Regions:
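Segments that shape or occlude catalytic/ligand-binding pockets
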Residues: 62-103
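Extended Gly/Ser/Thr-rich low-complexity repeat segments
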Residues: 124-138
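Active-site loop segments of alpha/beta catalytic cores
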Residues: 2-70, 114-117, 126, 139, ...
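A structural signal for short, hydrophobic beta-strand segments that form beta-sheets
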Residues: 104-108
């Protein structure tokens, strides 16, 4: 039996990538390292081309593409990044997760579904139809102050030595050896609480016990700043903080901008001050939906890069750049909807972003995971047009 080929080998031999011109080197590459190119782009400095990044793909999308020409060895997002030749980034650890998580328990198992309590403590019904649909949530682990004090807070202890047990010498060596942009997780201040409580419960708690919500946010802030600073002391340098919230729907956030500014903005400032202490002037938040009402709150707290800019929800990178100028950095912003339509629509969506990309600090890519209604041919054509327009 012949040895299985590596993903780079599959890429080099792939006929479809060659057909779409995706094996050719970047047309505007003048010798910057990946790190230099990323930093110059996000600092509004002259650059040969913008970095070539993408968000990722639904599992069902990759499964569809296997029937349309994508090698079956490419079966996850990391492998797809390598296969399509996207620019790499190095992520270093900061452990601010639960220690320990809840025990995973199957509470009920039928032909159609399974009811579980996951490692996150959430009781949920997970369907067996083979799709990655959102589970039906039944019960959340954080319902009141007693749950916070007895079940959740002990799992977030910043003094737990297990958080810091890493091969720091090896991590530091990888940072120094690879000329890649280096990112570190800076967690979440409100999105995590929503996950622990559920949307309706956290909305009610903001009114019924706002002191508890702020107490949790403060404790999480201490956990994040402590773990991030420890990691950076060990590693020495970082280029950006990578956060997550996902607290917006199509019509705006699940928390009022007033409360978000009161509770989160000054604490984001403490987190981003730690980043700046170690040379990182880029702080990104991953928030889907319509983020417009929260952008000022993030910017004032030092979170200056918005991602992934879901266009169909009303978050438009062109409008954000017009409003905020060089205060704001952008990543994403390519509406996924036209990718399922045709070449003309794909070209139009990318063309509308050219001037904003040229203005600096904007890395264009699909505004979320590529859904399974996008054909492989359409996606390759999208990559071809993006490469042509932006020199990738």
């Amino acid at each position: 039996m012949a040895d299985q080929k590596s993903i780079p080998e599959l890429r080099a031999e792939d006929k479809k990538l060659k057909e779409y011109g995706l094996l050719d080197g970047p047309s505007r590459d003048s010798g910057y390292t990946h790190r230099e190119r990323y930093l110059r782009t996000m600092r509004f400095q002259s650059v040969d081309r913008v970095p070539n990044h993408e968000f990722g793909y639904w599992d069902e999308t990759i499964a569809r593409w296997h029937d349309e020409g994508l090698p079956r060895e490419v079966s996850n997002n990391w492998q797809a990044d390598v296969f399509f030749g996207f620019d790499p980034m190095l992520h270093i650890p900061a452990d601010h997760g639960w220690r320990p998580g809840f025990e995973h328990i199957v509470l009920e198992d039928t032909d159609r579904y399974r009811i579980i309590r996951g490692g996150d403590g959430v009781k949920a019904m997970v369907y067996k139809d083979g799709t990655s649909t959102i589970p039906h949530y039944i019960e959340f682990p954080l319902k009141n102050r007693d749950d916070w004090e007895n079940e959740i807070k002990p799992r977030l202890n910043p003094a737990d030595p297990a958080r810091y047990d890493r091969d720091w010498e090896g991590i530091r060596a990888r940072v120094e050896e690879n000329q890649l942009p280096v990112a570190i997780s800076i967690g979440s201040l409100f999105g995590w609480i929503r996950n622990w409580m559920g949307f309706e419960n956290v909305a009610m708690m903001c009114m019924d016990d706002p002191e508890l919500i702020e107490e949790i946010i403060e404790y999480v802030t201490v956990l994040i700043t402590t773990t991030v600073e420890y990691s950076l002391q060990k590693v020495g340098r970082v280029d950006l903080g990578w956060g997550w919230e996902d607290i917006c729907f199509n019509h705006g956030p699940i928390i009022s901008p007033r409360l978000f500014r009161q509770w989160c903005t000054p604490r984001y400032k403490r987190i981003t001050d730690v980043l700046k202490k170690y040379g990182a002037d880029i702080a990104l938040t991953d928030c889907d939906g319509n983020i417009n009402e929260l952008v000022d709150c993030w910017l004032d707290g030092g979170i200056n890069c918005m991602f992934p800019l879901e266009v169909n929800s009303g978050t438009d990178p062109v409008a954000l750049r017009q409003k905020y100028g060089e205060r704001i950095l952008l990543a994403g912003g390519v509406n996924k909807i036209p990718l399922a339509k045709g070449k003309k629509e794909i070209e139009g969506e990318l063309q509308r972003l050219v001037k904003t990309v040229e203005s600096g600090a904007f890395i264009p890519h699909v505004d979320h995971r590529v859904p399974p209604d996008v054909s492989y041919e359409n996606y390759l054509y999208y990559l071809k047009v993006k490469k042509h327009l932006f020199g990738m």
